[in-house]
Curated annotation (Swiss-Prot):
PANTHER family, per database record: BETA-HEXOSAMINIDASE, BETA-N-ACETYLHEXOSAMINIDASE
Protein name per UniProt: Probable beta-hexosaminidase ARB_01353
GO cellular component: extracellular region; membrane
Family membership: Belongs to the glycosyl hydrolase 20 family.
One of the protein's GO biological processes: glycosaminoglycan metabolic process
A Pfam family hit: Glycohydro_20b2
Gene3D superfamilies in the record: Chitobiase/beta-hexosaminidase domain 2-like, Glycosidases
Task performed by this protein: Beta-hexosaminidase that shows a broad substrate specificity.
EC assignment: 3.2.1.52
Active site (UniProt): 361 (proton donor)
Organism field: Arthroderma benhamiae (strain ATCC MYA-4681 / CBS 112371)
GO molecular function: beta-N-acetylglucosaminidase activity
Region (Disordered) location: 96-117
Length: 616
């Protein structure tokens, strides 16, 4: 079920309900331009005729002290006091330009100032179930009220996790007046909301390049501010094995260095850091594909095609889609013993109820290098690699589940790949889709599978940076060979298979459930935006994720449409620009989205002046 259905918030002024026309929505934004948190509520109560609410020199806390709620408030309040934040990108009226011969525009009213309300002296927090565990579909809803005559900020939530979201909203709404040197909230208001989807996350890949624990925590801080709640941690890959495994300590010989290893203590520290911010960590040990480093240290026979030339200088003979090659030999009995032992240790480290088993991009040519697979095919002349993979699925899922019960996730390839696929995947396995966009989402949900959306054409954050494999003659071209027609170096992808670069608008405008029936929509658990790390490490991971991941955050929390079903892209522009500034003020190195001129001149950098240009 679509989680909480965004709680069906209604927007009203004291004088009545706001019409949901674009002009009315813009007018509403102008009445309190500093109240523009991300994710943006679809609609909310605004007391537009009331004045500012100043904060007392000290705001006291009145609420639960357990489950980390008090600690979350202290982080919120200390951030407010330290940053002395004032929004850097405010919403403005529809610009008036010198008209083209038949163009005209009408001026917009400015909001009227009103006398300030009662000073805010305390925050009062009520949580119905303070012991609620952080888990899939936990209630994350909250209400946040600042009334004109009250001296308290009122927060109500079902669980500690909703209260945390209220704090991150409040952080973005309290601003600082340099002239009076006082903190204030521009207008009394009430926000009451919850997420559309229970899984809202990003994928961090530490297998291609190592990502330090401090940088992982930086991503968690940004996630918490934007209400993302799942870190999909793709820990290992063929290129390296950075995870400490006590059962097989030799695996970390394939880490890039002894310093580039996640110890058990570090893993637990990251998980706890995430939990304190309302974020679950879902581990992925990608198997049976993308498996060479680490595995081969246990037994070289565990890995097929590990010593092959990945492209064979002739792509029809490739053994991997990128260097270095290697897949678990699924016809070798010892593979299953090692998998079970490894899962037992990893599942004891990661407490989440979901566990990702990988399963993407299996290459048939790789198994031509396996004596065990060759023998199996000879002994089963009527069977194919699809049948062998089915045997792998039927053998591993029950065995792993018996060790420690989890809900397993596979990449969709395990069922839909044209290369190698199983014929049957249990319906209780979640499938994460990255190919085929709307078509694959429809195909999976119509067949009864719960789905996590990671469509590469919309959500892949590493795309559009050209190729990274070296000694590539395709770049050695001095003149355009096909003028007027895009090709590799001239208007083409330049070696990035998933080009172009995914802008925040591309992410935000993705209506991934638009072609689904009601029952099919119930199978969408949410979305995760991957950032594969072939060209990513500590130096650039944060600006690659942020602020684009914030567009995903709003899409999955409150949606990209207003309550009348119209796209909110026009008003999202100032909101995400401002959120980027808020991230950088917090020491999170998010990339700029536009020249600063655009922040200072709202909508002067739009492609079209019509606020309804983005249709849906």
């Amino acid at each position: 079920m679509r989680f909480a259905k965004a709680l069906a918030i209604t927007a009203v002024l004291l004088s009545g309900v706001v019409e949901a026309t674009s002009d009315a929505v813009i007018e509403e934004a102008l009445k309190a331009p500093t109240i523009n948190p991300l994710p943006g509520p679809v609609t909310w109560y605004l007391h537009a005729d009331e004045g500012r609410k100043y904060l007392a020199p000290f705001v006291s806390y009145h609420g639960p002290h357990k489950s980390g709620i008090r600690d979350a408030w202290e982080r919120c309040y200390s951030t407010i006091r330290r940053l002395k934040w004032y929004p850097q990108a405010l919403e403005g009226p529809i610009p008036k330009f010198d008209p083209f011969p038949d163009q005209s525009s009408k001026p917009k009213e400015k909001r009227q100032n009103a006398p300030p309300g009662a000073m805010i002296r305390r925050v009062r927090v009520k949580v119905k179930d303070v012991d609620a565990k952080l888990a899939h579909k936990v209630d994350e809803s909250y209400s946040l009220t600042v009334s004109a005559k009250s001296e308290a900020i009122e927060i109500e939530a079902q669980t500690p996790w909703g209260a945390r979201h209220a704090f991150t909203t409040l952080q973005q709404i309290v601003v600082y007046d340099e002239k009076s040197q006082r903190f204030y909230i521009e207008r009394p208001f009430t926000i009451s909301e919850g997420p559309l989807y229970p899984i809202r996350g990003i994928l961090l890949d530490s297998g291609r390049n190592f990502i330090s624990p401090s940088k992982i925590k930086e991503q968690l801080d940004a996630m918490a501010l934007s209400k993302l709640n799942v870190l999909h941690w793709h820990i290992t890959d063929t290129q390296s094995w950075p995870l400490q495994v006590n059962t097989y300590p030799q695996m970390t010989e394939d880490a890039y260095s002894k310093r580039m290893v996640y110890s058990h203590a570090t893993i637990k520290e990251i998980i706890e850091y995430a939990r304190q911010r309302g974020i679950r960590v879902i581990p992925e040990i990608d198997t049976p594909s993308h498996s060479s480093s680490g595995w081969k240290r246990i037994d070289p026979d565990l890995v097929a095609c590990g010593n092959s030339w990945w492209s064979n200088d002739f792509f029809p003979h490739h053994t991997a889609l990128e260097p270095n090659p290697g897949q678990l030999d699924i016809a070798y009995n010892k593979t299953y013993e090692v998998l079970e032992n490894l899962y037992k240790e990893v599942s004891s480290l990661f407490e989440d109820e979901f566990h990702h088993l990988g399963g993407d991009e299996l290459q048939p040519n790789c198994y031509k290098f396996s004596k065990h697979v060759t023998k199996w095919l000879a002994e089963h002349p009527d069977m194919t690699l699809n049948d062998l993979l089915q045997e792998y699925v039927d053998r591993t899922l029950p065995a792993l589940d018996k060790i420690k019960h989890r809900r397993f996730i596979y990449w969709e390839d395990m069922l839909l790949s044209e290369q190698i696929h199983a014929e049957r995947i249990p319906r209780n396995v979640v499938l994460q889709t990255w190919n085929g966009g709307l078509d694959n989402i429809k195909k999976l949900t119509s067949n009864g599978y719960d789905v996590i959306v990671s469509s590469a054409d919309f959500f892949y954050l590493d795309c559009g940076n050209g190729g990274w494999v070296s000694n590539d003659p395709r770049y050695n071209v001095m003149r355009n060979p096909t003028p007027g027609t895009p090709n590799f170096n001239y208007g083409g992808d330049g070696g990035s298979w998933c080009a172009p670069y995914k802008t925040w608008q591309r992410i935000y405008d993705y209506d991934f459930a638009s072609e689904l029936t009601g029952p099919e929509k119930e199978h969408i658990l949410g979305g995760i935006a991957p950032l594969w790390s072939e060209q990513i490490d500590d130096a650039n991971i944060t600006p690659k994720f942020w602020p684009r991941a914030a567009a995903l955050a709003e899409l999955l929390w409150s949606g990209n449409r207003d309550k009348e079903g119209k796209k909110r892209t026009y008003l999202m522009t100032a909101r995400i620009n401002n959120f980027r500034e808020y991230l950088t003020a917090n020491g999170i190195g998010a990339a700029p989205l536009q020249p600063r001129y655009c922040l200072k001149h709202p909508h002067h950098c739009d492609l079209y002046s019509d606020p309804n240009a983005v249709l849906g």
